[in-house]
Amino acid sequence: MKVAKSITCNSIYTEVDAIMYDNGKIYLGLSGEERVQLPLSMCNRHGLIAGATGTGKTVTMKVLAESLSDAGVPVFLCDVKGDVAGICAPGADSEDMQKRIERFGLTGKFAYRGYPTTFWDIYQTGGHAVRATVSEMGPELLSRILCLSEAQTGVLQIVFRVADDRGLLLDDLKDLRALLNYVNDHKEDYRMKYGNITTQSVAAILRALLPLEKEGGELFFGEPALDVNDWIRTDAEGRGMVNVLDCVKLVQNPTLYASFLLWLLSELFETMPEVGDLEKPKLVFFFDEAHMLFRDAPAVLVQKIEQTVKLIRSRGIGVFFVTQSPADVPNTVLAQLSNRVQHALRAYTPTELKAVRVAAQAFRENPAFNAEDAIMELGVGEALTSFLGEDGIPAMVQRTKIICPQSLMGAPEAMTRAKAILRDGMEKYDEAEDNVSAYEVLADETQAAEEALAQERERLEEEKRAAEEEKQRRKQAEADEKRAQKLEDEARRRAQKLEDEERRRAQKLEDEARRKAEREKEKKEAEEK
């Protein structure tokens, strides 16, 4: 067998055997001289990796991820501290590592190597963009992210209902903002159909969007939305793709972090077909800082998580919760986690001692040691383990020294990470798309309404102008008529005056003629006498 001392991410996989995965089982470590193995077919029965800070949870998670990748199973890892990213690069040799390699019986077989890795980052700095649409997130999870009251959540549900009924796509936060304003403007129209919508609740939701946008919501919500099928890939050599989500910044917003992970689970459940129990899972998720999923979560949300975890196994999906104490996970969810790795817990208070006792009682008893005492005695890289056997029965708890990973412990060099990002084939997510959605539709409607209103105003103004012109015309006509009547009356008076004067003149002439005739007659008579 040819052994390579150091193999990079794009090396020829056939140069080494998958030393920690063999015959359908994952080699996780040693209990004494006995190999502790996890059947691959049981990985979709979910699991728990718990332990105090610095006890080796990350190493356990990486060892499982490497073996799953070797088995051709894609993996999802949350990188909370930045050290998980080293899985893309070969590990570094040291004297201590050589001792561990010898201790686990891997001398001559062990090879440092990186694994096929795709980096993702909601903030788009440490990997490809991860986006979801507002519609996909849904009102329940969005209400939790925004810390809305019951009344405000009810209004948000109405807004989503209006979007569904109108066929409006809610891709990003500007779509949601536009629809909130639209619903508020038309609340009287929607009141009878959907219920009461108050301006105060709408204003509160709009205010809650401001910090979300500032914390990365503007980057997270949009298109192209993540296609979960892009996480279910293998490389050219058949190794499962290791999808690493950069959570160093995201985890600083626990509510957004938890809501994103829950959305992811729900999306997988709704997207993936029913397949039942398989020889190996289609995808395995490791959710670090799992306690954030349940912190301050309402009962209905915890119930949804329980239901999703319970049913997603039939989709061929395995889920491992990684947290400090089993007490961080509700009992209803804890009951679904059949594969357990318990690292050391530190207990000083009654509450902490009770948590240790509960953690120990979750294991099938081993008469060789006391599990409760062992949990507090475990060293770094050591754990109590219990996995389902191939018959589905939990094995007795074993005190196990966890095997060493083949990839780099710690963050890789920036160039190594950059090269992995460039060659993973997921560049389609790097550029945001602004498709026609609620914002554009409502903007067009608003513009059309404004144009129609402007046209109506112009029509009314035109009618007003026409009426005013008609009024002026009639007024002018009346004035002209009065003026004409006045002129006619004046002409009639003048004509009458002229006629009277003519009559008087004629009468005067007639009288003068008569008097003249009389004078001439008198003169003639006088002459005749």
Model-inferred region functions:
Residues K2-E15, M20, A129-S135, M376-E488, ...:
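Conserved P-loop NTPase motor module
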Residues V16-R35:
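N-terminal pre-Walker A segment at the start of P-loop NTPase domains
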Residues L30-S31, V36-N44, E237-G238, D277:
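Phosphate-binding P-loop
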Residues I49, T53, P326:
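The conserved Walker
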Residues K57:
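Conserved lysine of the Walker
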Residues V63-A65, C88-K109, Q307-I393:
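Conserved ATP-driven motor cores of ASCE-family P-loop NTPases powering translocation/secretion/packaging/pilus
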Residues A65-V75, G82-Q307, V333, M376-L378, ...:
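P-loop NTPase motor domains
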Residues A526-K529:
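Membrane-active amphipathic alpha-helices enriched in small hydrophobic residues
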